[in-house]
Structure formats: C-alpha cells, structure tokens
C-alpha cells in the first residue's frame, strides 16, 4: 500500500508541475544566435533600434506568474521590459519594466562570441491565458549598467528558433517575420508559467550549463543578429 500511495503521489506531483507551465519555447541555447532587444528605448551597438515579439499558442490555461527567458549581454544586465498582448508588440494583456540582478538573472557561461549568457526568471502579472489561444510576448528595452547595446534574446535549437512566430520591430515599425540569410527563424528561448520565481530549473536548463561550457571548445557559427 505504501508503494502504491507513493506512486500515486509522484504522478500527482508531475501533473501539477506540467499544468503550471502555460507555454515553453524550449531551453536556452546560448551558443548560436540571438536577436537584439534594446529598442525602442535604446539603440544597439550597431546603431539600430530593434526589439522582438513572439506569437505562441498557450498549451495550458492560467494566470501567468513567471517569465523565464535566455539573454545575451556583454555586461551584467540591469533591466528589460516585457509586453504580453493579443497582437505582435501589443501590451493589452500585461506589461512591465523589470530590474535585473544576480538573483533573477543567473549567469550561465560566456559563449564563443564573448557574450555572457543569462537565465532570466522574473515574476509577471497579466490577464488569464486560455489554452489554444494565441498570445504575443515581446522583449524590449534591455540594457546593462554601461548601456553598451549588446543585449539579445537567445534563439534556441541551434539558432533556428522554436515553433513560435518571430516578428522584428525596427524604430517602432513591425517588419514582420524574423529572417536571416533568406531563412525565416522561429521563436526565442522563453517559458511562461503559473509559478512565481524563484522556482526549480528544468532538467534541460541544468544540463545546458554543462553543454554550454563544452561548446566553447568549438567554432560557433553565428553572432548576435540584426535585421536589415
């Protein structure tokens, strides 16, 4: 009876963990590519003013309590803005500017391009999301103490992106799909959950730290990306 009860308890705990995740675009890559997200408040170091919005279909219903995303930055990041909306770059569901520190923006490793890769996990507030409905998450106005314009949103899956739709905005104008070398890229690294950080990292995120360190030994293919 004890064995059976323990088994049932384990299943229930797993179910609760899964239901807490409203949507996940995949674990942080950190080694291949990222999109600048310093705009519209700040230019990146190449002089353009760019931010990114990802359209996704909610896997579960719930009130978002936490946002986790992968950030590239030469200096330790100090703040960013998020917007949640029913359309690209919209904020009708929720938005805020978030201060960053060593607790909510955990340094993972320095990649082969010289960027620090950070696991950012912060509490958020928005209206209830419904499973099967489409929403948009935008990351904007990312910066660090030096305001060096190096902040980017990590692109997972070897730099090809996940299943979400990626839109790019330049100087306040949405140019639509995120394209590199004629290839349309998918969404960036992020997870939206019911949980309020800090929460236990997923096993894939823990494994990533080790794989990222090993990745420094190879020659990486891409660097921080700007749409032109």
PLM-predicted stretches and their roles:
Residues 73-164, 168-170:
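Aromatic- and Gly/Pro-enriched, solvent-exposed loop/edge beta-strand patches characteristic
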Residues 37-50, 110-115:
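Extracellular beta-rich ligand/substrate-recognition surface
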Residues 46-57, 120:
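Short beta-strands within extracellular/lumenal beta-sheet-rich domains
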Residues 23, 33, 52-54, 75-76, ...:
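PGST-rich, cysteine-poor low-complexity/disordered linker and tail segments that act as flexible spacers
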Residues 58-66, 77:
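Extended extracellular/luminal ectodomain segments enriched in beta-structured repeat modules
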Residues 217-228:
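C-terminal membrane-anchoring or membrane-association module
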Residues 19-40:
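Boundary/junction segments of secreted and surface-exposed precursor proteins
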Residues 1-24, 190-211:
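Short, threonine-centered small-residue motifs that mark membrane-proximal processing/anchoring sites
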């Amino acid at each position: 009876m004890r064995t059976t009860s323990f088994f049932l308890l384990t299943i229930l705990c797993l179910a609760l963990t899964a239901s807490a995740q409203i949507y996940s675009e995949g674990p942080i890559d950190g080694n291949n590519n990222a999109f600048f997200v310093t705009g519209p408040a700040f230019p990146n170091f190449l002089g353009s003013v760019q931010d990114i919005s990802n359209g996704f279909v909610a896997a579960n219903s719930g009130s978002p309590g936490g946002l986790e995303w992968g950030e590239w930055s030469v200096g330790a990041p100090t703040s960013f803005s998020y917007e949640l909306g029913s359309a690209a770059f919209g904020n009708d569901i929720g938005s805020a500017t978030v201060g960053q520190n060593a607790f909510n923006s955990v340094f993972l490793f320095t990649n082969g391009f010289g960027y620090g890769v950070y696991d950012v996990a912060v509490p958020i507030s928005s209206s209830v999301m419904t499973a099967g409905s489409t929403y948009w998450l935008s990351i904007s106005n990312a910066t660090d103490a030096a305001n060096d314009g190096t902040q980017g949103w990590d692109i997972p899956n070897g730099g090809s992106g996940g299943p979400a739709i990626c839109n790019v905005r330049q100087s306040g104008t949405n140019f639509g799909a995120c394209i590199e070398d004629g290839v349309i890229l998918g969404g960036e690294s992020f997870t939206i959950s019911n949980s309020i950080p800090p929460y236990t990292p997923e096993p894939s995120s823990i494994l990533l730290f080790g794989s990222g360190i090993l990745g420094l030994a190879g020659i990486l293919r891409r660097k921080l990306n700007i749409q032109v």
